[in-house]
Amino acid sequence: MNTTEVMETASDLLDGVIYDAEAFSVQDCQYIADLLASQGYALRVKPEFSLVYAVPEQVH
């Protein structure tokens, strides 16, 4: 994934889009997770359902 694709994917995730986990490499997920974290969100992966989605970070 290039930088533009990572940014577009992160934006889609913030908009509530759910992706197939098989579409991303581990490195792609790390880049996306870092970008989401900067926006106060966390990347969640549910391998048993092959889903990738964003959730708001918990405030402690």
Spans of features found by a protein language model:
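A short, charged, amphipathic alpha-helix used as a generic interaction element across diverse proteins
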Residues: 6, 24-43
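Compositionally biased amphipathic helical and low-complexity segments enriched in hydrophobic
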Residues: 14-15, 36-37, 44, 52
